[in-house]
Swiss-Prot record:
Disulfide bonds join 2-23, 5-18, 12-25. Its main location: secreted. This is Peptide Cn29. Keywords: Disulfide bond, Secreted. It comes from Centruroides noxius. Expressed by the venom gland. It is found in: Secreted. It comes from the Eukaryota. Negative results: does not show any toxicity upon intracerebroventricular injection into mice and abdominal injection into crickets. Has no effect on human voltage-gated sodium (Nav1.5/SCN5A, Nav1.6/SCN8A and Nav1.7/SCN9A) and potassium (Kv1.1/KCNA1 and Kv1.4/KCNA4) currents (in vitro). GO terms for cellular component: extracellular region.
């Protein structure tokens, strides 16, 4: 979970990961 991820769709926020301080959506 990328706690710093704001906005985007629910799937991105829930399944995404943090890379270099940015939210990367899960596949």
């Amino acid at each position: 979970l990328c706690l710093s991820c704001r906005g985007g769709d629910y799937d991105c926020r829930v399944k995404g990961t943090c890379e270099n301080g940015k939210c990367v959506c899960g596949s």
